Amino acid sequence: MCIRDSLLASKVTSTKELKNSVKVKYEHKGKEIDVEFDKLIVAVGRKPNSEKVLPKNLGIKIENGFIQVNEYCQTSVENIWAVGDVVRGPMLAHKGSEEGIMVAERIANKQAEVNYDLVPNVIYSHPEIAWVGKNENELKSSGIKYKVGKFPFAASGRALAVDQSVGFVKVISDEKTDSILGVHVFGPAAAEIVQQALISMEFGSSAEDIALTMFSHPTVSEAFHEAALSVNNQAIHIGNKK
């Protein structure tokens, strides 16, 4: 999938199949727009079917198809556990794998947990989109004051060299403590950059910690470094806010 135009707060109202294309009518910002596309992909989401596969006499609580579990993936029946897409949270393979490891450890009477605040999300489009932690809307809703640093791949030497200069890295940190609250990447190697951010956040790094870390040159990872520098108006290869 190649992203050319991304529209939010939009609604498809009708589609019509033509001879060699598909006509799509949608609403955006109060306007009705008609566009023709070569192909139309419809993503309708997924939902669990736990109610159909679990015997009712087990006594396991289910809500909206999801098996109800505690923070350690234990169901309402003491010796039955559930992980992955059938329980709450994002339907991601790595999230389910970590839950499986946690459950195995706890069954063996060992301490283990999953940090659900730091689950990496990746959209494998072209360019890639990836994020971890909070976004600005979530922080505003929670009343948390924050700072933002942003760096475009158009200013990255490596991104320009490989002709993948579309996109940016955004770092959000706490206004007082400077702790990184969220990292969002749109562009080349987004999934890999977010993984670096996740490790940093797992160990409580601040934007300044990343800013003081040496990054290899030329790499697309430097965009993460520059975005962290930008949080405190110290970016090197772009202008800073006054």
Each predicted region: which residue ranges?
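Short, small-residue-biased leader/transition segments that mark boundaries at the very start
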Residues: 1-3
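A conserved short coil-to-beta-strand element within the FAD-binding core of flavoproteins
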Residues: 8-21
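Short, acidic, Ser/Thr-enriched surface-loop or helix-capping motifs
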Residues: 27-29, 70-71, 174-175
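Flexible, glycine-rich terminal cap/loop adjacent to redox cofactors
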Residues: 125-135, 140-242
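Internal hydrophobic alpha-helix adjacent to the cofactor/substrate pocket in enzyme cavities
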Residues: 94-117, 145, 203-205
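General small-molecule cofactor/ligand-binding pocket signal
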Residues: 7, 35, 147-149
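Short loop/turn motifs at secondary-structure junctions and domain boundaries
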Residues: 18, 52, 58-60, 161-167
